[in-house]
Amino acid sequence: MDNYQIAENFSLLSKLMDIHGENSFKAKTYAIAAYHVENLPEQLSNTPQEKISVIKGIGPKKIHTIWKEMEIESVGELLYACQENRLKLYKGFGEKTQQNIIDTIEYYLHNQGSYLYPQVEEVAPQIIAYLEKLFSAENVFITGAFKRQAEIIDELEFVVNSTNELIKPRFVSANPPELLEEKPGSLLYKLLNGLRLRLYTGTENFKKSVFTTSGSAEFTAAFEQQFTGIDYNNSDISIFEQAKINFIPPCLRETAAIIEKAKSIKIPHLIQACDIKGIIHSHSNWSDGSNTIEEMAKAAKEKGFEYLVISDHSKSAFYAQGLSEEKIAAQHQYVNELNEKITGFKIFKSIESDILNDGSLDYSNSILATFDVVIASVHSNLKMSEEKAMLRLLKAIENPYTTILGHLTGRLLLSRKGYPVDHKKIIDACAANHVIIELNAHPRRLDIDWRHIDYALQKNVLISINPDAHTIEGFEDIRYGVLAAQKAMVTKEQNLSSFGLKEFEDCLGKVKELKGVR
């Protein structure tokens, strides 16, 4: 039964209840359900039953609050809301309930087969240590998507200098992993935590396998087709020297196009986490963050950063205790006091202003003018056609007070597709209006997608790697943004948050001058 048929049955039930004088509220509920089912992006018949009842301990009333009041429609969105402390703002959702939901959802997601990079990164060291203990360190090499710093990992891959026949008995233990697949030259296991482990095996072409599996299928096929007679029994550097092209680091070995680029240009020194000089886009307990502004500023300074951009939610984000005009004035006064108190460091006044349905921002120009930085983001009515999304975003980009375009598509990896946009038109508009594009470093966002950053760099649009931190610990997410930026060949000169304090202030002043709002 498809969604249309399910919707038809709900609609019929609603009409029959009206005819028989049943409770009008119940009848209307079925009519509303019919509308929503018919407009679902995925077929309900394809949704596993366990997905509907995945979160134990949440009754119908809480589900109603989550869906109707919080406007949350997927497990991933709910997890993200918990991580941002949003559930605690609603009646019946305490800290314990919120943590229970996080634990249950993470367990569920771990069994779906795909993982975010940091989830795999957390367990990879133990797996590496285990394999090295079995086969010795010189015979084990990590490879594949994880080595390329992919944002989503389906399998953790290793090259092991041994044969299938010798490896399989070594995996027999009290809790052996499940052998899912065996092929000549590879074994695929499923670990107890649900993660799939692929081992590329064999001793004859061991060193070649280390290199060829480090790239995507497209990259490797193009490399092998173009460069024959390569001696793979050497380092990666030697392999590229033999091919007479510039060295390509593993994170860039995704497409054939990078090979053509490496023939003519030297790959620049890619941005590193240590290049980040300031925290841009952070939330305090004035909205939905966990820490005070002072706590966040002192922590940022202790970590070696030169400045902090506090970008609490705007007034339309009622679910996140968005700031009214009065609260903005009070916060700005408080920031002034902190800047006098904390020396050798600066806090910048900012806001994450909601892009409304018509593309306008949710404050008057006189209020927007009081901020050092305005991050414009979409948080509501995410189910848009490309035409609607483009109209909304382009108008926000054209607003002279927009400094940074936040999380461009609104996606949540493994949970929610972003709304459809024409990336090139968005980037062109940012270039024309002197708007910086955020690379939201939260590992569940990583938005703008790194695949579109190259075009932004061609158009001289600055990228800003921002943690979207709701806690002090959230500062650490910067690293995941850097890993994504490296895949787009971003240098520190092309990233706003790499600017030192003076350079950052100068950049903000220049942008405002170009926009005519200084």
Language model features with spans:
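Long, highly charged, low-complexity intrinsically disordered interaction regions
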Residues: 1-84, 89-91, 100-107, 241, ...
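Solvent-exposed, charged amphipathic helical/linker segments at domain boundaries
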Residues: 107-118
